[in-house]
């Protein structure tokens, strides 16, 4: 199985914890799924911690340090602040898979908005009260399909 790694020269905007975490992940040969199971988080949420896009709880830090063999004090120091979200990807993205996700929003964003507004009214889907997961499906012909679920709390706009 191939594992996600990080070339820090290609990602200069990531926090120092990213390099620490990815180096230990590669050394231990763990997938995000394996790490997520150990720390009790979703694999996408776990990967988001590695990329500096999600806040690690004290328990996450303890469990990551133990699993990956990183001194806990180092991780506490590197993961102690609040994430500076949204800086890790240039816009529009150049990485092909990330660009396809961007392209989905470009092509279907207004369609999603229209359908969501019809179903829920005027508002937005939260990316804070939010969860996501990635699943793999194989059809009868043996083709693999990526299934990405986005689940966000509906937040109606306030009238004032």
From Swiss-Prot:
Q: What name is this protein filed under?
A: Cyanate hydratase
Give start-end ranges for the coiled-coil region(s). none
Q: Member of which family?
A: Belongs to the cyanase family.
Top enzyme class:
lyase
Q: Which domain of life is it from?
A: Eukaryota
Q: Does the keyword Transit peptide apply?
A: no
Xref: InterPro entries: Cyanase, Cyanate_lyase_C, Cyanate_lyase_C_sf, Lambda_DNA-bd_dom_sf
Q: Which GO terms describe its biological process?
A: cyanate metabolic process
Q: Which organism is it from?
A: Aspergillus oryzae (strain ATCC 42149 / RIB 40) (Yellow koji mold)
EC no. given is 4.2.1.104
Family annotation (Gene3D superfamilies): Cyanate lyase, C-terminal domain, lambda repressor-like DNA-binding domains
Q: List the active site.
A: 100, 103, 126
Q: Does the keyword section mention Lyase? A: yes
What chemistry does it catalyse, as a reaction equation?
A: cyanate + hydrogencarbonate + 3 H(+) = NH4(+) + 2 CO2
Q: Give the function comment from the record.
A: Catalyzes the reaction of cyanate with bicarbonate to produce ammonia and carbon dioxide.
Which Pfam families does the annotation name?
A: Cyanate_lyase
SUPFAM superfamilies cross-referenced by the UniProt entry: Cyanase C-terminal domain, lambda repressor-like DNA-binding domains
Query: Which keywords does this Swiss-Prot/TrEMBL entry list?
Result: Lyase
Q: Name one GO molecular function term.
A: cyanate hydratase activity
């Amino acid at each position: 199985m191939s594992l996600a790694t990080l070339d820090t020269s290609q990602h200069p905007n990531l926090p120092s914890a990213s390099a620490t975490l990815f180096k230990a992940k590669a050394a231990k040969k763990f997938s995000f799924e394996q790490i997520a199971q150990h720390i009790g988080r979703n694999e996408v949420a776990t990967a988001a911690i590695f990329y500096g896009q999600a806040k690690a709880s004290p328990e996450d830090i303890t469990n990551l340090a133990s699993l990956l063999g990183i001194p806990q004090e180092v991780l506490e120091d590197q993961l102690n602040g609040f994430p500076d979200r949204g800086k890790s990807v240039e816009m529009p993205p150049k990485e092909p898979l990330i660009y396809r996700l961007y392209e989905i929003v470009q092509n279907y964003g207004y369609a999603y908005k229209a359908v969501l507004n019809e179903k829920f009214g005027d508002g937005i889907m939260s990316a804070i009260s939010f969860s996501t997961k990635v699943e793999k499906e194989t059809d009868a012909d043996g083709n693999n399909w990526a299934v990405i679920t986005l689940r966000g709390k509906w937040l109606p706009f306030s009238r004032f």
